[in-house]
Amino acid sequence: MDQIRIAADSSCDLLTMDGVDFVSVPLTVRTAVEEFRDDAALDVDAMVTTLRGTKGRTFSACPNIADWESAFGESGDVLAFTITSSLSGSCSAALAAKKRCEEQNPSRRIFVVDTLSAGPEIALLIEKSAAELRSGKSFEEVCTAVQQYQRRTHLLFALESMHNLAQNGRISKLAATMAGVLGIRAVGQASEEGTLEMLGKCRGARKTQELLLSEMVRLGCRGGSIRIGHCRNAAFALELCTEIRRRFPGAEVKSYPLRGLCSYYAEHGGIMLGFAS
């Protein structure tokens, strides 16, 4: 069986994967004077510190068509995963690269998944595809399994800071400032359309945890694989892991620091939570 490659932009927070041919395609975070490429060399903590003190506009930039073509390689079938198309042009670039590659080699098959999400939910989709590949499934079978699984996966998030969202124009600076002054944490989800949908506002870690857990139940979580990414908030992530294991015995829960792109959006203290129903 020919090797099947998995390619994903860096919103998945993965750099390598055991037992599969995996390529990460970096996004970039930019200020007026500095650029942070979301690859293995990025010092995420230094980036977060710099951005917290940045007063001017900041923004993220997606991989271009050539970046995706390079990630797809010159031969073989590819499964590609991108951050939601509602936040980035990464999916459009990947689709354009797919078209070029398949025109150059009509025997190739490149399947691009607009995940309508980011971070831990994408990680779950990639883990699912890798598991299917390791079990010997065909390219078509893996694509079908991923599509079916995507219908059941979800992303929740809790933000302590919305500075970067304000700096790149996604929310008003007044709203971000008020949230910071009042100690409000915004809890939301990736909607079915792949947009950021706010679910509620909380004060304090305990109320934030309770809202996240109640939303997991509402969305049909019964355990299984659960992934928690955090930006400088390992203590809260650990507490959340512990409570999830208590409420969902047998759940396979992992927490980890977010990489560059997700740390840009989640910011200092932010949490991203991926699971399936």
In which residue ranges do the predicted regions lie?
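Mixed-charge interfacial surface used for oligomerization/domain docking
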Residues: D2-Q3, S11-V29, V33-E34, L87-S90, ...
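A glycine-rich beta-strand to alpha-helix segment
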Residues: T82, F111-V112
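Structured helix-beta-strand junction loops
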Residues: T54, E74-S75, F81, R152, ...
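N-terminal glycine-rich anion-binding loop in soluble enzyme alpha/beta folds
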Residues: I4-C62, D67
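N-terminal glycine-rich phosphate/adenylate-binding segment common to multiple enzyme folds
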Residues: I65-C101
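Short glycine-aspartate micro-motif
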Residues: R5-A7, V78-A80, L258
